[in-house]
Design a protein with these regions (language model features):
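ABC family nucleotide-binding domain
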Residues: 1-145
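H-loop (His-switch) and adjacent beta-strand-loop-beta switch element
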Residues: 142-155
Length: 155
């Protein structure tokens, strides 16, 4: 990527990368739908159009019955699905997932990895950062970095 001004970099990042955070980063006063459509609203899309744009993603992630719930009314797995839906809402070129299963129980973690596999099969590239070797084994390609140095590549 060429050197860009900070504003240009922010616009590019918001358009091209969908971020999935370990601790969800949901806005507690927003309901599920508001959290999911937020990236589209930031881009200037109106609420009704943004909600329509996200309808399929909400269905895909099994959140139809939760759209009016606030984050404190959701399980960890549901919060992570909202985080994933929000990352997908702007149709980014790549998803960047930081420890996406780190705050989840085993069953919810497996559910997220299964969802990532489905999303990847649908053409969504995913770059996942994890310290959990079992989670890394779910990836098609693994790059291992130790002390800032590339030490191993698989796949």
């Amino acid at each position: 990527m060429k050197y860009r001004k900070r504003e240009e970099t922010e616009i590019w990042r918001n358009k091209e990368i969908g971020f999935i955070f370990q601790n969800y980063q949901l806005i507690p006063t927003y309901n599920v739908l508001q959290n999911i459509i937020m990236p589209l609203l930031v881009r200037g899309m109106d609420h009704r159009t943004a909600a329509k744009e996200c309808k399929e993603t909400i269905r895909l992630l099994g959140l139809e019955e939760r759209v009016t719930h606030k984050p404190n009314e959701l399980s960890g797995g549901q919060k992570q699905r909202v985080s994933i839906a929000r990352a997908l809402s702007a149709k980014p070129a790549i998803l960047l997932a930081d420890e996406p299963t780190g705050a989840l129980d085993t069953a919810s973690g497996k559910e997220v990895l299964k969802l990532f596999a489905q999303l990847n099969e649908m053409g969504n590239p995913i770059m996942m950062i994890t310290h959990d070797l079992k989670v890394a084994q779910a990836a098609k390609r693994v790059v291992r970095i130790e002390d800032g140095c590339l030490t191993e590549m698989e796949g």
